[in-house]
């Protein structure tokens, strides 16, 4: 019977055990959750969890630091809530799992904010002081947002990469990798952003489409006799012509110093209206069509035969400054997918070009590098001096046309590198930088950094497993790491370098420690204000302070050193058990942390890596302002509750994209209500139950109660297995099924009659309540990691003397004898009950009965089903929720069926069963015999249900 109907009956005469609970049906989450956040903080719940966990094995989830800039968005919410679920579930599994949140504080975005607010001419000391203040303000804002989501952690003592101790330890980490021999200085093309005025890390580069001019350019013959010999000809049939390159970067032509051919590709000498052209043989037809020329192949030769031939610069006739020749070098990276099969080489602006030219004997001083840090050519560059390279593109094309070197020019849309902060195009630009060498062997010998890092990946568990190959291929193919940046707000590469040679001071390691001590006292400002004479005396005449700062990925990438073993070493430990971030961090934090730990420790800094996907809308589209499909976690928390966000995240397979929309949130809210209603039923029916006073020993429970506890214990074993593997969506799916079907649709449905109509203190009712007590103990704990607000709210009603559900560990259910057989038997009974329910529904549709209690059923069953049904005796009717039930034996499954008949008896006013003995006691004409017994005598005897 439903509570509603029971409540509508006059209760005074024949009361039933309908109880209430202070746990309301409506969650009213937006109003209640902030009160819990406040209470958790005021009562020091995180500290109480730490005290309760002390001495247990440690489990360290190390927080990848978000950047201290801007409001938190849905991606932040996904990340922090997943971490919170992991930490809470590990604490409840019997670990000491602290959570120390952190923030990444140095770097370009904050420097840009300070420039926007105060201009670009601030003294360095003021930039630093304002950057610190800005980062602190942003952290406090984000902290409030994270706490509102129900994330528990050491919010009073987070780590910040700008804290003095962290800055100092980062300098010490730099000293470690220098000592081991991984760091070198060199000229090399690096990702360069003109707006940043600095080198960029690989992780700071994003790709988007850009339209540029694409050009085919001829470099005229400089050595016609040698060229003829290379093609096996006595002489060239005509003097005009040359070799043809294709490029999408016209601005690099002024800096050309070589041409690259593949040694094995066959090149053709083609006679055309524009002279003799050298093009890869397999590209001749396409190129002739593109150039609108007709051509005849005169001779062919493999690339190896053309090595070291020289050709005139294509602007040689336009200005004397370009009167130089370009040699042919061989390179395996040349392809014939597009273009001409010939690559022009400007070593200052391409990694492969640079490596090729250096390997052919070119020195750093030989390299032509006319592009300045702001994207303009040096003033002295012939024809184009002072122009920005992007403005120069069309002018270079016109100059080539005027010089007679241009064969074709058209617009070309291609995927091109952009700065992730400024969204502007970047280039490779050769600059003098500090690098960590991927293929460097440490001074002590052993494996290279690349080899060590790849071994570290092999030793790491990945969730999901595909992350391993992704990170492996990135490390296997990455270039040396550019450690240096040309900024102010960052940890300094606190070296003294020789003014003439650029060499490090011989006491560099000792000096780094001296600087670290000063930074520990007063921050990186100590380096800015340091007079070199304080540390190196008269050597200051020969050595100067290095002005570079460390890549911010080195800041966060060394948190395993300056947090796990530095600022928070008392709480944390190395290596961490888990790093958990979005899939972009294979290029970012996972990557830089692996490299720094491989250099410092010769191993990965983590035992496991968990990767989650990004949020998309209901149609699978990325969230963007232009589409207007973004969802703000603050808005959802204030409208529906943070619990709904938590349940959405936990119920979604985070290994792929996480789809969210109003429709999805509506479904999640409905699922939440089902769980909440289950908890309300449990708490209401336990409100007059005191475990110490009323609990029934397990061997005296009714059979269905033993089944329910055995089933719940088995389910919990499955759930804990999922929690251990960080599989949260199966936990949610199974718990929702458990609440709606196993409990709501079966066990609690069957239990209502016993709970409401049995004598309040009868063994039958107390057996049910004892089982419900154990179920509630178990359920609240497995819900707590993701439904944290609701589990805590229910726990305070259930166990008011306890501080919090979060200091508990997963519940140890009482042992039920023969649990496996019992679960198997009741699976059969539930199967039969499903058939009975279907038959009752058909009878109701045909207007033969009203409620199921108006029915009497005969179940025709065979084999194990017959045995299971008959074992329940007269209690079978309670399981089927009918007023009477009988079992008829048949030979086999084919003859099994259910007969439904309407009862011919009166309905009991109290229990609503239709029974022959209604009115058997004249003074209670509307009461059945069992209700009379339950109210006025010793109560009915029930053994199974």
Curated annotation (Swiss-Prot):
<keyword id="KW-0547">Nucleotide-binding</keyword>
<dbReference type="Pfam" id="PF06827">
    <property type="entry name" value="zf-FPG_IleRS"/>
</dbReference>
<feature type="binding site">
    <location>
        <position position="928"/>
    </location>
    <ligand>
        <name>Zn(2+)</name>
    </ligand>
</feature>
<dbReference type="InterPro" id="IPR023585">
    <property type="entry name" value="Ile-tRNA-ligase_type1"/>
</dbReference>
<dbReference type="GO" id="GO:0005524">
    <property type="term" value="F:ATP binding"/>
</dbReference>
<comment type="subunit">
    <text>Monomer.</text>
</comment>
<dbReference type="GO" id="GO:0008270">
    <property type="term" value="F:zinc ion binding"/>
</dbReference>
<feature type="binding site">
    <location>
        <position position="908"/>
    </location>
    <ligand>
        <name>Zn(2+)</name>
    </ligand>
</feature>
<dbReference type="Pfam" id="PF00133">
    <property type="entry name" value="tRNA-synt_1"/>
</dbReference>
<dbReference type="InterPro" id="IPR050081">
    <property type="entry name" value="Ile-tRNA_ligase"/>
</dbReference>
<dbReference type="InterPro" id="IPR014729">
    <property type="entry name" value="Rossmann-like_a/b/a_fold"/>
</dbReference>
<feature type="short sequence motif" description="'HIGH' region">
    <location>
        <begin position="66"/>
        <end position="76"/>
    </location>
</feature>
<comment type="function">
    <text>Catalyzes the attachment of isoleucine to tRNA(Ile). As IleRS can inadvertently accommodate and process structurally similar amino acids such as valine, to avoid such errors it has two additional distinct tRNA(Ile)-dependent editing activities. One activity is designated as 'pretransfer' editing and involves the hydrolysis of activated Val-AMP. The other activity is designated 'posttransfer' editing and involves deacylation of mischarged Val-tRNA(Ile).</text>
</comment>
<keyword id="KW-0479">Metal-binding</keyword>
<dbReference type="InterPro" id="IPR010663">
    <property type="entry name" value="Znf_FPG/IleRS"/>
</dbReference>
<keyword id="KW-0030">Aminoacyl-tRNA synthetase</keyword>
<protein>
    <recommendedName>
        <fullName>Isoleucine--tRNA ligase</fullName>
        <ecNumber>6.1.1.5</ecNumber>
    </recommendedName>
</protein>
<dbReference type="GO" id="GO:0002161">
    <property type="term" value="F:aminoacyl-tRNA deacylase activity"/>
</dbReference>
<dbReference type="GO" id="GO:0006428">
    <property type="term" value="P:isoleucyl-tRNA aminoacylation"/>
</dbReference>
<keyword id="KW-0963">Cytoplasm</keyword>
<dbReference type="GO" id="GO:0000049">
    <property type="term" value="F:tRNA binding"/>
</dbReference>
<dbReference type="InterPro" id="IPR009008">
    <property type="entry name" value="Val/Leu/Ile-tRNA-synth_edit"/>
</dbReference>
<dbReference type="Pfam" id="PF08264">
    <property type="entry name" value="Anticodon_1"/>
</dbReference>
<feature type="binding site">
    <location>
        <position position="931"/>
    </location>
    <ligand>
        <name>Zn(2+)</name>
    </ligand>
</feature>
<dbReference type="InterPro" id="IPR001412">
    <property type="entry name" value="aa-tRNA-synth_I_CS"/>
</dbReference>
<feature type="binding site">
    <location>
        <position position="911"/>
    </location>
    <ligand>
        <name>Zn(2+)</name>
    </ligand>
</feature>
<keyword id="KW-0862">Zinc</keyword>
<feature type="binding site">
    <location>
        <position position="581"/>
    </location>
    <ligand>
        <name>L-isoleucyl-5'-AMP</name>
    </ligand>
</feature>
<comment type="similarity">
    <text>Belongs to the class-I aminoacyl-tRNA synthetase family. IleS type 1 subfamily.</text>
</comment>
<keyword id="KW-0436">Ligase</keyword>
<dbReference type="InterPro" id="IPR002300">
    <property type="entry name" value="aa-tRNA-synth_Ia"/>
</dbReference>
<dbReference type="GO" id="GO:0005829">
    <property type="term" value="C:cytosol"/>
</dbReference>
<dbReference type="InterPro" id="IPR033708">
    <property type="entry name" value="Anticodon_Ile_BEm"/>
</dbReference>
<dbReference type="InterPro" id="IPR013155">
    <property type="entry name" value="M/V/L/I-tRNA-synth_anticd-bd"/>
</dbReference>
<feature type="binding site">
    <location>
        <position position="625"/>
    </location>
    <ligand>
        <name>ATP</name>
    </ligand>
</feature>
<keyword id="KW-0067">ATP-binding</keyword>
<keyword id="KW-0648">Protein biosynthesis</keyword>
<dbReference type="InterPro" id="IPR009080">
    <property type="entry name" value="tRNAsynth_Ia_anticodon-bd"/>
</dbReference>
<feature type="short sequence motif" description="'KMSKS' region">
    <location>
        <begin position="622"/>
        <end position="626"/>
    </location>
</feature>
<dbReference type="InterPro" id="IPR002301">
    <property type="entry name" value="Ile-tRNA-ligase"/>
</dbReference>
<dbReference type="GO" id="GO:0004822">
    <property type="term" value="F:isoleucine-tRNA ligase activity"/>
</dbReference>
């Amino acid at each position: 019977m439903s509570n509603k109907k029971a409540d509508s009956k006059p209760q005074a005469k024949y009361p039933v055990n309908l109880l209430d609970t202070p746990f309301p049906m409506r969650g009213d989450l937006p109003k209640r959750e902030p009160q819990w956040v406040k209470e958790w903080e005021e009562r020091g719940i995180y500290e109480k969890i730490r005290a309760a966990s002390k001495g247990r094995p440690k489990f360290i989830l190390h927080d990848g630091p978000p950047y201290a800039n801007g409001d938190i968005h849905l991606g932040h919410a996904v990340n922090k809530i997943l971490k919170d679920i992991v930490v809470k579930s590990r604490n409840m599994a019997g670990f000491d799992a602290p959570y120390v949140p952190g923030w990444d504080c140095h770097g370009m975005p904050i420097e840009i904010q300070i420039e926007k607010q105060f201009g670009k001419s601030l003294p360095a000391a003021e930039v630093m002081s304002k950057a610190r203040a800005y980062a602190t303000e942003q952290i406090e804002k984000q902290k409030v947002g994270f706490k509102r989501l129900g994330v528990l952690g050491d919010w009073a003592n987070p780590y910040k990469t700008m804290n003095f101790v962290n800055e100092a330890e980062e300098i010490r980490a730099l000293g470690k990798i220098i000592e081991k021999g991984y760091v070198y200085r060199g000229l090399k093309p690096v990702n360069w952003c003109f707006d940043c005025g600095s080198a960029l890390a690989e992780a700071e580069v994003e790709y988007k489409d850009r339209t540029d001019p694409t050009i085919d350019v001829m470099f005229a013959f400089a050595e016609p006799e040698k060229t003829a010999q290379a093609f096996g000809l006595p002489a060239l049939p005509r003097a005009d012509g040359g070799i043809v390159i294709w490029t999408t970067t016209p601005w690099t032509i002024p800096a050309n110093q070589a041409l690259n051919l593949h040694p094995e590709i066959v090149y053709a000498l083609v006679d055309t209206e524009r002279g003799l052209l050298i093009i890869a043989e397999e590209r001749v037809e396409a190129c002739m069509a593109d150039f609108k020329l007709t051509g005849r192949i005169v001779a062919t030769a493999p690339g190896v035969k053309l090595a070291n031939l020289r050709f005139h610069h294509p602007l040689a006739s336009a200005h004397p400054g370009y009167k130089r020749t370009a040699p042919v070098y061989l390179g395996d990276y040349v392809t014939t997918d597009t273009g001409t099969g010939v690559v022009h080489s400007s070593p200052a602006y391409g990694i492969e070009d640079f490596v090729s030219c250096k390997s052919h004997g070119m020195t750093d001083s030989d390299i032509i590098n006319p592009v300045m840090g702001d994207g303009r050519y040096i003033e002295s560059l012939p024809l184009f001096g002072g122009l920005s390279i992007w403005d120069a593109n069309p002018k270079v094309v016109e100059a080539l046309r005027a010089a007679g070197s241009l064969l074709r020019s058209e617009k070309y849309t291609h995927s091109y590198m952009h700065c992730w902060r400024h969204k502007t195009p970047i280039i490779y630009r050769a600059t003098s930088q500090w690098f960590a060498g991927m293929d460097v062997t440490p001074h002590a010998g052993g494996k290279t950094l690349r080899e060590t890092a790849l071994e570290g990946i092999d030793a790491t568990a990945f969730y999901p497993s595909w992350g391993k190959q992704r990170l492996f291929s990135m490390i296997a193919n990455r270039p040396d790491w550019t450690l240096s940046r040309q900024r102010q707000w960052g940890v300094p590469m606190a070296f003294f370098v020789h003014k003439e040679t650029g060499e490090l001071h011989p006491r560099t390691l000792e000096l780094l420690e001296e600087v670290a001590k000063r930074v520990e006292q007063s921050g990186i400002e100590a380096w800015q204000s340091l007079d070199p004479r304080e540390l190196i005396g008269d050597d200051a005449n020969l050595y100067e302070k290095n002005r570079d700062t460390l890549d911010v990925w080195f800041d966060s990438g060394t948190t395993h050193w300056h947090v796990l073993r530095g600022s928070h070493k008392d709480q944390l430990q190395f290596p961490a058990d888990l790093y958990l971030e979005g899939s972009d961090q294979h290029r970012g934090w996972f990557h830089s942390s692996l490299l720094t730990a491989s250099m410092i420790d010769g191993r990965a800094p983590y035992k496991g890596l968990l990767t989650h996907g990004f949020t998309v809308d209901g149609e699978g589209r990325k969230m963007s302002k232009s589409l207007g499909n973004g969802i703000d976690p603050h808005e959802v928390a204030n409208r529906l509750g943070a619990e709904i966000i938590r349940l959405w995240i936990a119920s979604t397979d985070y290994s792929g994209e996480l789809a969210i929309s109003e429709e999805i949130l509506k479904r999640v809210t409905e699922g939440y209500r089902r769980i909440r209603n289950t908890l309300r039923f449990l708490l209401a029916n336990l409100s007059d139950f005191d475990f110490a006073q009323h609990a029934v020993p397990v061997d005296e429970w009714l059979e269905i109660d033993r089944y329910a506890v055995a089933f719940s214990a088995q389910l919990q074993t499955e759930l804990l297995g999922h929690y251990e593997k960080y599989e949260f969506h199966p936990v949610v799916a199974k718990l929702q099924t458990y609440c709606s079907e196993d409990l709501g649709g079966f066990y609690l449905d069957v239990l209502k009659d016993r709970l409401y109509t049995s004598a309040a203190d009868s063994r039958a009712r107390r057996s049910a309540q004892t089982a419900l007590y154990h179920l509630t103990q178990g359920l609240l704990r497995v819900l707590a990691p993701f439904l944290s607000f609701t589990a805590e709210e229910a726990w305070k009603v259930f166990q008011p003397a306890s501080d919090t559900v979060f200091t508990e560990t997963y519940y140890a259910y009482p042992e039920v004898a023969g649990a496996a057989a019992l679960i198997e038997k009741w699976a059969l009974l539930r199967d039969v009950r499903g058939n009975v329910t279907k038959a009752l529904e058909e009878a109701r549709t045909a207007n033969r009965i009203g409620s199921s209690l108006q029915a009497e059923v005969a179940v025709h069953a065979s084999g194990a089903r017959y045995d299971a049904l008959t074992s329940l005796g007269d209690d079978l009717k309670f399981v089927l929720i009918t007023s009477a039930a009988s079992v008829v034996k048949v030979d086999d499954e084919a003859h099994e069926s259910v007969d439904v008949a309407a009862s011919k008896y009166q309905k009991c006013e109290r229990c609503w069963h239709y029974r022959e003995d209604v009115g058997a006691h004249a003074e209670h004409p509307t009461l059945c015999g069992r209700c009379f017994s339950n109210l006025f005598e010793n109560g009915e005897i029930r053994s199974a249900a």
